[in-house]
Amino acid sequence: MNKTVGPPTITPTGLSGGMNSTTGSSSTSNIYSSYYKAIDQFQNKNTTDKDLHETLKQGPISSNLFYNNFLNELNNKNNNFNNNNNNNNNNNSNSNNNNNNNSNIVYSNNMSNNYNNNYNNRFKK
């Protein structure tokens, strides 16, 4: 039985280390807010490259730093997602579950490749 599989959740933990300024916690909140807003815009097919660039320019971190943290966070989530599915495959002999888990891994890898390709096309020109 096929099931719909969503992408892993992306959280801004990659931005937490060393990103706090002397102005207090509001700086971190601004970083998180900008991070989530840019991710939302990145996933919205109606968003133009100009809109996305404007969001990143208004954020409290540089586009390159955002790009690197975005990919690191995505790769961390993708690796955890794959590791969990690999563990499920090793511990579960039910062929239907194994097939579903393998599909999840392929989906997750494809999603990561799509994010990386889209991001490279939009920001690494």
Curated annotation (Swiss-Prot):
Name of the featured protein: Putative uncharacterized protein DDB_G0277407
Region (Disordered): 1-27, 76-125
UniProt lineage: Eukaryota, Amoebozoa, Evosea, Eumycetozoa, Dictyostelia
Domain of life per record: Eukaryota
Record field: compositional bias (Low complexity): 18-27
